[in-house]
């Protein structure tokens, strides 16, 4: 039976504090392990417990993934009767949310590397582990799901040693579902993870790990105290801006919100200062006291830049103001979300947004639609290109419609990512074929005991759309992927403009690898022909590269039978009526506008189908 106590806060000895993250691949049981730690250490009663306690968003529970990092403080009394204060952060496992992992690790001295003992090491496990090692975080390997009949903990422990290169033969074996091995895990955390360094007598230095917006309280920030002590009612300063605020409330999550009157060196907690401007407390910034400020800011986590860009437009223009405010609130607790205003002739006013990947984009879109009731159109995602012009100037662009004339461009360079793919050997042939199809170049291939680690350099534009889905398909779901930007490489790209009755539709302009241009153009033109409603005149749809039409289709006009009342008689009367109709159609085509419903754009621009 675990010897746990219920939240005896105010531990003065920093040697009793352990700050750690839980990192793992998606579906390896980290959220369930968090639930078990909370339950067994008395964080919540049996009645208050629910599956995936820390996955607070409905989207997280529906998709079965962790999107936002969540923190909890619990207290534990070990076998010697000593009280330890455990602060742990549950982190996402999907490749798109690796920035959340780096933020969590910046606040910790240790990390539990949770690996499913039925599946083994995955590519994202590898990436997160190397991130932790680079940040000098102590790694504690944990083999989860030992209650399952197909568990092979010894094999997976050897895999961890072979692939990652850290000792794992004595790794903790546990089952987050049944609670088996959890007590041993807590003892290992206490023994192996170092206590936080810092001085309670030094000027306050607090790292902002995360922030979110509360409609009633304003900005709520999750912080880690690196040095000093923070009291309620203190006057604090945001070091990057120099602005001062008074502390209204401070506290911790247990995981219930619990108010305190102070946070001490080494602790992780939340702070409310009545900040209403959502960019006034940026994630990664340092807080200090205005009276006795620290000299230097804390070196925070690695800032992540957006990898893909897409235009987001409200379906109706009256939702624009609401959309702008919603993006501002979402960007507060998502450091990687970038946005700037954009205007499209076809879609109206919206925003050009930057994301870490397609899943990240889909999550943001789903949150905007669900939490703020905004109906959106999302354009086809693109990457950022480096362009060298004839005059020697270098520019970076992510919007195809803004690309200069191809005759003014000397070189176009596209971003290349290094993809690490872990897979059982039997799927190797199919995966190599897929990588070649995506213009990949093999860098390395290493055989381990039961898996193969493939490294390929692949254009990011090929990876972001549906590479992950295709990889899962050809490997029956067993392969895992992790990728990282490496460099820009010259490529022959072409800009494809879509014209409707000779008028360019900016929202449908795309960039394509020159060998794929014909097929992509034909797909879009054929799709538009099916979706655009017929008018009283012919509608021509053209795909154009440098004023040369490479694909074309025509939507035939609706035609009234003007001869329906002519029962015989002079043929000249029929010819006159037909000529009159023909002249009318010509005039209509000159002055008539093609009505393209926004639902057509919604269907054409669907990222998965495109």
From Swiss-Prot:
Asked if the record carries the keyword Membrane, the reply is: yes
List the membrane topology term(s). Peripheral membrane protein
Could you tell me where this protein is found in the cell?
A: Cell membrane
**Principal subcellular localisation of the protein:** membrane
A GO cellular component annotated for this chain's UniProt record is: plasma membrane
- Residue ranges constituting the tr-type G domain according to the UniProt record: 15-197
Coiled-coil residue windows: none
On the tree of life, the source organism's domain of life is: Bacteria
Q: What EC number(s) does the entry state?
A: 3.6.5.n1
- InterPro entries xref list: EF-4 (IPR006297), EFG_III/V (IPR035647), EFG_V-like (IPR000640), EFTu-like_2 (IPR004161), G_TR_CS (IPR031157), LepA_C_sf (IPR038363), LepA_CTD (IPR013842), LepA_IV (IPR035654)
Instruction: Give the GO biological process terms.
Output: positive regulation of translation
Positions bound to GTP: 27-32, 144-147
Sorted alphabetically, which keywords does the UniProt record give?
A: Cell membrane, GTP-binding, Hydrolase, Membrane, Nucleotide-binding, Protein biosynthesis
Pfam families listed in its UniProt record: EFG_C, GTP_EFTU, GTP_EFTU_D2, LepA_C
Q: What class of enzyme is it?
A: hydrolase
Catalytic activity from the UniProt record? GTP + H2O = GDP + phosphate + H(+)
**Listed GO MF terms:** GTP binding; GTPase activity; guanosine tetraphosphate binding; ribosome binding; translation elongation factor activity
- SUPFAM superfamilies listed in its UniProt record: EF-G C-terminal domain-like, P-loop containing nucleoside triphosphate hydrolases
Record-stated family: Belongs to the TRAFAC class translation factor GTPase superfamily. Classic translation factor GTPase family. LepA subfamily.
Q: Which PANTHER family match?
A: TRANSLATION FACTOR GUF1 HOMOLOG, CHLOROPLASTIC, TRANSLATION FACTOR GUF1-RELATED
**Stored NCBIfam families:** lepA, small_GTP
Q: Which HAMAP family match?
A: LepA
Q: What does this protein do?
A: Required for accurate and efficient protein synthesis under certain stress conditions. May act as a fidelity factor of the translation reaction, by catalyzing a one-codon backward translocation of tRNAs on improperly translocated ribosomes. Back-translocation proceeds from a post-translocation (POST) complex to a pre-translocation (PRE) complex, thus giving elongation factor G a second chance to translocate the tRNAs correctly. Binds to ribosomes in a GTP-dependent manner.
Q: What is this protein called?
A: Elongation factor 4
From which organism does this entry originate? Buchnera aphidicola subsp. Acyrthosiphon pisum (strain Tuc7)
Upper taxonomic lineage:
Bacteria, Pseudomonadati, Pseudomonadota, Gammaproteobacteria, Enterobacterales
